[in-house]
């Protein structure tokens, strides 16, 4: 299962221009299928990623939801309250990663 989650996370990183929501405070009782089911009401969900902690075996309480269209992401962001397993989760747009700068570029002297 960990290998498939790693492949899914890598696929999300490669899909920079895809509409992806970052979800925080996901209850440990929730599964990726529940996440997908909840967000499907806003638009077609391509995939959900819940990274797991190797030591505890539980997911980390955060995840990503990739929508098929920008409209699905927009609809999800417009909803004020997202309740999963009785817990209000936080939904944000995924911020693109900034290019890493080397130590030489950081020095300005």
Curated annotation (Swiss-Prot):
Keywords: Mitochondrion, Nucleus, Phosphoprotein, Repressor, RNA-binding, Transcription, Transcription regulation, Transit peptide. It is found in: Mitochondrion; Nucleus. The keyword Transcription applies. Residues 19-103 form the RRM domain. The modification Phosphoserine is found at residues 15, 102. Its main location: mitochondrion. One of its GO terms (cellular component) is mitochondrion. InterPro entries: Nucleotide-bd_a/b_plait_sf, RBD_domain_sf, RRM_dom, SLIRP/GR-RBP-like, SLIRP_RRM. The modification Phosphothreonine is found at residue 101. Coiled coil: none annotated. PROSITE patterns: RRM. Transmembrane segments: none annotated. GO terms for molecular function: RNA binding. Pfam families: RRM_1. CDD domains: RRM_SLIRP (cd12242). RNA-binding protein that acts as a nuclear receptor corepressor. Probably acts by binding the SRA RNA, and repressing the SRA-mediated nuclear receptor coactivation. Binds the STR7 loop of SRA RNA. Also able to repress glucocorticoid (GR), androgen (AR), thyroid (TR) and VDR-mediated transactivation. PANTHER family: HETEROGENEOUS NUCLEAR RIBONUCLEOPROTEIN 87F-RELATED. This is SRA stem-loop-interacting RNA-binding protein, mitochondrial. The gene is SLIRP.
């Amino acid at each position: 299962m960990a290998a498939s989650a790693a492949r899914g996370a890598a696929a999300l990183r490669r899909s920079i221009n895809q509409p992806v929501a970052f979800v925080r405070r996901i209850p440990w009782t929730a599964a990726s299928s529940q996440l997908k089911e909840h967000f499907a009401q806003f638009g077609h969900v391509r995939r959900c990623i819940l990274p797991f902690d190797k030591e505890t075996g539980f997911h980390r309480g955060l995840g990503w939801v990739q929508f098929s269209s920008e409209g699905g992401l927009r609809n999800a962001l417009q909803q004020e309250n997202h309740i999963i397993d009785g817990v209000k989760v936080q939904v944000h747009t995924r911020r693109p990663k900034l290019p890493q700068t080397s130590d030489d570029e950081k020095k300005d002297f």
